[in-house]
Design a protein with these regions (language model features):
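Asp-based, Mg2+/Mn2+-dependent phosphohydrolase catalytic module
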Residues: 1, 98, 112, 116-211
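N-terminal helical cap/lid subdomain that shapes the substrate entry/recognition surface
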Residues: 1-92, 100, 113
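Conserved SAM-binding loop
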Residues: 4, 11, 86, 104-107, ...
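Ser/Thr-centric signal marking residues that sit
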Residues: 10, 14, 84, 108, ...
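Conserved short hydrophobic patches within well-ordered secondary structure
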Residues: 18, 43, 47, 72-73, ...
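Residue-level detector of anion-binding/catalytic polar loops
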Residues: 32, 103, 178
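Well-ordered alpha-helical segments embedded in enzymatic catalytic cores
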Residues: 89, 93, 146-149
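Charge-rich, acidic-biased intrinsically disordered regions
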Residues: 94-101, 108
Length: 211
């Protein structure tokens, strides 16, 4: 059996970090600041698309959007950790999986360095069996190649995938035996239900994940 996790919106709340970066650039360019509601609405498809969507809500000049998006990306990579915190129950659940000897993986569209920095800060005593990221040669989600690789390496038992967005669902479909979407993440319960996801895959707490 193996457990595979998304990072942002599933294990950690990175919105405060993202808003710090986004609003610094917006303020420097005399643009309206962003907030948590807007950030959740544009999150889930990677950093650059998030930054670009935030800027397109304010301006239409593509050159300026490209310039400011690049500035946001640089600022984020300088410090991807400050403000990011684990969701309640995440640390205990990961440690439980480690104690009972389960194989675990992280599949993230983040680069490996910022992802590792976040893990070291939020989960200092836990180590994933494997981490999959784009700069390690893996296609970003919704590609399921990384998930298929994990399944080939650890074929025994059920494969469980835990994410929080439609991107995660697409990644896990037809590969994972069980899929859970966290309602505390970027989409929330109401949005996930309105998007057509069945309630029996939605979880409000890590304790609802079957073993």
């Amino acid at each position: 059996m193996g457990y595979v996790f998304d990072l942002d919106g599933t294990l950690v709340d990175s919105v405060p970090t993202l808003l710090r970066v986004i609003n610094k650039v917006l303020e420097e360019n005399s643009l309206p600041l962003s907030d948590r509601v807007e950030n959740l609405s544009v999150a889930g498809w990677g950093l650059l698309p998030m930054f670009e969507k935030t800027l397109r809500n304010r301006i239409s000049d593509e050159r300026e959007i490209a310039r400011m998006s690049s500035e946001m990306l640089v600022l984020y990579r300088e410090d991807p950790v400050t403000g990011t915190v684990p969701y309640p129950g995440a640390y205990d659940f990961l440690m439980h999986l480690s104690e009972i000897g389960e194989h675990t993986a992280l599949i993230t569209n983040k680069l490996l360095t910022p992802a590792t920095m976040i893990l070291d800060r939020c989960f200092p005593d836990f180590r994933f069996t494997r981490i999959y990221s784009p700069d390690e040669g893996w296609e970003p989600k919704p590609s399921n190649l990384s998930l298929q690789d994990f399944r080939r390496r650890y074929p025994e038992g059920l494969l469980t995938y835990i994410g929080d967005t439609e991107l995660d669902y697409r990644t896990a479909s037809n590969t994972a035996d069980r899929i859970y979407l966290a309602t505390w993440g970027y989409r929330g319960r109401d949005r996930l239900i309105s998007d057509g996801f069945p309630e029996d895959i939605l979880i409000d707490d890590f304790s609802q994940i079957s073993e």
